[in-house]
């Protein structure tokens, strides 16, 4: 049966890819992905047939994978982070209903919530949720409801897609929503370019986060009531009693 791997490539550097992901890419004849992600693979896979599509051509990218697989080639579709977390794994299964004799296999990767948390310290050490601020596929009113529910439930929150060229004020809007239920001195932080050249992080308060300059390669963390700043790192208490 024809084979397609749906590969989570992690945040960027090869060192942060799982061995399973590298093995899948090495076993593939064709690697398909968003232009930026293919460039991140570097020289290691240049002997493969590399096919790219620009942003917002996700459906075309998925169909391309199936067409190549039906030519008898083993295909990998690469997604940043984990393919099943804001990636293309679900879309591949949906589109796959149109094609026969193609086996799909999802290869997990390190998502930005995990890799970004490691840079910041230990902000996800208790219950947490992830929320994307992109309204391309989810209406803003639903995003707002999720922000409110997360704040009221005292979850640590990892925000994906906090800004873009067309959504420059979305993080500010999200902070304004959270500030209705959370005090402005709540410990927060954000990481830019996780696992790539120029990785940097900032620890701040929710009030300060409101005016932070972020982009689409930034992941934002809002702490819960038990989150504190220790030696410049963002740490959420698990609940152990320390004497």
Residue spans for each PLM region:
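A polyampholytic, Gly/Pro-enriched intrinsically disordered region
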Residues: 73-79, 123-133, 207-216
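A contiguous loop/helix-start segment that scaffolds small-molecule binding in enzyme catalytic cores
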Residues: 4-6, 152-243
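Class I S-adenosyl-L-methionine
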Residues: 1-104, 115
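Class I SAM-dependent methyltransferase SAM-binding "motif I" and its flanking Rossmann-like core
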Residues: 85-153
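Short gly/ser/thr-rich secondary-structure transition/capping motifs
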Residues: 10-16, 137-140, 201-204
């Amino acid at each position: 049966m024809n084979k397609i791997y749906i590969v989570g490539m992690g945040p960027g550097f090869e060192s942060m890819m799982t061995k399973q992901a590298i093995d899948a890419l090495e076993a593939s004849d064709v690697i398909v992905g968003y232009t930026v992600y293919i460039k991140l693979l570097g020289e290691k896979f240049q002997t493969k047939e590399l096919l790219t599509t620009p942003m917002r051509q996700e459906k075309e990218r998925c169909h391309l994978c199936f067409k190549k697989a039906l030519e008898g080639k083993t295909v990998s579709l690469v997604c940043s982070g984990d393919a099943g977390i804001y990636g293309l794994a679900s879309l591949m299964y949906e589109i796959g209903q149109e094609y026969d004799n193609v086996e799909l296999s999802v290869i997990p990767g390190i998502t930005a919530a995990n890799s970004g948390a490691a840079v910041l310290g230990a902000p996800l050490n208790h219950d947490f949720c992830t929320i994307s601020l992109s309204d391309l596929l989810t209406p803003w009113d639903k995003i707002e409801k999720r922000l409110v529910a997360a704040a009221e439930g005292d979850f640590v929150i990892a925000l994906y897609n906090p800004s873009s060229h067309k959504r420059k004020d979305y993080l500010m809007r999200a902070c304004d929503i959270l500030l209705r239920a959370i005090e402005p001195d709540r410990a927060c932080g954000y990481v830019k370019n996780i696992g790539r050249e120029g990785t940097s992080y900032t620890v701040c308060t929710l009030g300060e986060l409101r005016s932070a300059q972020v982009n689409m390669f930034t992941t934002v963390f809002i702490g819960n009531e038990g989150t504190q700043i220790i030696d410049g790192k963002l740490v959420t208490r698990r609940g152990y009693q320390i004497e």
